[in-house]
């Protein structure tokens, strides 16, 4: 406030100063509002860590107003079942995405196309049955991937191509029966692989993956137990402990399949045979060609007892041969020592024993002198 005796000029200058301060304050407020990212409704946002927590809210869709600078987005424990391909568009700064404990059954091919800086992806406990081979192609920095507790029956070839930074991978509790070694070849820096609680069929289809597991363990990778479900002889046994003799029949099976491929192929078969046409009255029914698929012969591996028996017999034979070699060496040493002792005693007796021819000549000389 101005003093009562102030001049009109002073009052004008003071009003102008207040007007300038007001304009500056308004501009600062507007800039602060524009710079402050909006937080989705009912979600919790941390401006320091750039984390948006929308977990446990019963969401059926991804909030559309997630700030573009978000680095961590938590969407676990919701009711997400189907996501559009643009659900995470313009979130190129996102590093961690958690979609665990939802009802997702499929993921669009390009849903993670903008997540070029993603390092951790959690998809645990969903209903995912299939994955597109290009799903993770645009996330080369991914380090941790959790696909456990889903309905995956197979992994498409090329799914992990380009994921050189991947350190841990969880495939536990799915419906995987076998895996292709080529699918895991690009994971040169993988350190932890979890594949337990799957219905593994330890047959020829898993032979190459067994070789890869041995190489993975040799270079220091950590791998949980891969327990066989089939065949019955191997049920509950760790795949890594199965002798390689169990897979000797695989080469024979491949030879049989290759030789069978040289035959002239017949008509394509169908799983369900079509219904036979009704014959006309008075006409004899014509035999219809069979279109049912022949049942594929299932080759079962050799018995575990037979393989173990072979190993035991080989060990016994090697042991017997070693014992015989030790006995022969001992006998040779004893014989050599006895012969050496005999020769020493013989040398000692030679000076004491006279020459019989010399004694006979001496007797002749004595008789001649006499």
Curated annotation (Swiss-Prot):
The keyword rRNA processing does not apply. It is a single-pass type I membrane protein. Keywords: Glycoprotein, Leucine-rich repeat, Membrane, Repeat, Signal, Transmembrane, Transmembrane helix. Residues 36-310 are extracellular. PROSITE patterns: LRR. Residues 36-68 form the LRRNT domain. Its main location: membrane. Residues 261-300, 351-370 are annotated as: Disordered. It is found in: Membrane. Residues 1-35 form the signal peptide. The chain crosses the membrane at residues 311-331. Disulfide bonds: none annotated. Residues 332-370 are cytoplasmic. The keyword Transmembrane applies. One of its GO terms (cellular component) is membrane. GO terms for biological process: positive regulation of synapse assembly. Residues 198-252 form the LRRCT domain. Glycans are attached at residues 90, 117, 125, 257. Pfam families: LRR_8, LRRNT. This is Leucine-rich repeat and transmembrane domain-containing protein 2. The gene is LRTM2.
